Amino acid sequence: NFSNSHPDVLIGLERILGKAPELFEVDCCDAGAMDRTISAISKRGNISGVIHFAAYKAVGESTEQPVKYFQNNIGSTATLLDAMERHGLQTLVFSSSCTVYGQPDEIPVDESAPILPAESPYGYTKQVCERLIQDAQSSRPEINAALLRYFNPIGAHPSSEIGQLP
């Protein structure tokens, strides 16, 4: 869905890419919908991995509606990992967050910093999702995963076609 974005992003992507990206509007918490979508793409033989950016992202809102964040952020990741296993997909790029570091002891923070208690439900969901992915890797060593821990991404594509949504 476009709860954190807007369909107009697709117009900007089309201008940059020179062709329209294919869109599958899917509730990532719906296992049946995920299976149908991955099956449809896999039948074409052109799926090599998954980029998982489907999550609620407002720290403040997460303190007001923590259950909503747990259900969506953790639920969608668990559902996706399950679907990936059923379809033999082994590569995942996960959009995590610097919030997994909690209140770090040292600044600047790098990848070797310890994971400390999260300061928000949003941060906690990212910690849990990272753990789910790491546990999936432990049980299936063929899984390749990258956990992207963003700080404050800002700016737009040089064309200004994408990158300025809140």
Q: Residue locations for each model-derived region?
A:
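N-terminal Rossmann/SDR dinucleotide-binding element
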Residues: 1-49
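N-terminal Rossmann-like NAD(P) cofactor-binding module of classical short-chain dehydrogenase/reductase
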Residues: 48-51, 93
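Active-site beta-alpha loop architecture of Rossmann-like, nucleotide-cofactor-dependent enzymes
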Residues: 5, 56-60, 101
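Catalytic helix-loop patch of NAD(P)-dependent Rossmann-fold dehydrogenases
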Residues: 64-79, 86, 90-91, 100-152, ...
